[in-house]
Amino acid sequence: CSSDLADYRNWVPKRLLAAIFCCFLAALGVAGITGRMSQGGWRTALLWIFVLLSLFFMVLFIWMSCLYRAFDYKGSRRMSAQIIDGIAARVEIPEEGRGLDIGCGSGALAIACAKRNPAAEILGVDRWGVDYGSFSKGLCERNAAAEGTGNVTFRQGDACRLDFPDESFDAVFSNYVYHNIPGRDRQEILLET
């Protein structure tokens, strides 16, 4: 159960939804302009290309909107909250143990594990870059304060190059991370973890 003051954000950015919708409108507009031209030859082909393109963007917008609703932490679907709570329920760290959340994003999983393991220290690491610009170390720290967890800290880190000695943590957990690392051997990344 999370505080109403915490802001865990959504893994589907509103900017992405807006960009897809703008692409839909642009393709629809070009299709409309092309449709007003005299028909025949390349103009008909161009019309169909932009009609199909606008349909593609419309379907993509609907699909991404459904994902946005599903991954809304505080919304009616609450899939994110169910996933976070489900993972945290399985993380058991011994007293004075250490846990590591790789790719912590907004801190939701690290904070949930810290709340379930109050005698342990939890560290959340993320690279917090342009790809997920709405997430940051500051956001994680504000969320931890809103949830009243004093046993969780956050720092910049990379899932591909973790700078910790082997066996530094009693538990390592993650959520929505490894599939976002392009062009890497997943087994190699998991072994690094």
PLM feature spans:
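Short, small-residue-biased leader/transition segments that mark boundaries at the very start
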Residues: 1-2
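Class I SAM-dependent methyltransferase Rossmann-like catalytic core
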Residues: 12-18, 62-83
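Conserved alpha-helix/loop element of class I SAM-dependent methyltransferases that forms part
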Residues: 78-96
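Conserved class I S-adenosyl-L-methionine
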Residues: 95-105, 123
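Conserved SAM-binding loop of SAM-dependent methyltransferases across substrates and taxa
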Residues: 106-118
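Conserved SAM-binding strand-loop segment of SAM-dependent methyltransferases
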Residues: 148-159
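A short acidic, Gly/Pro-enriched loop at the edge of an enzyme's catalytic core
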Residues: 160-171
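A short, conserved alpha-helix within the catalytic core of class I
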Residues: 181-192
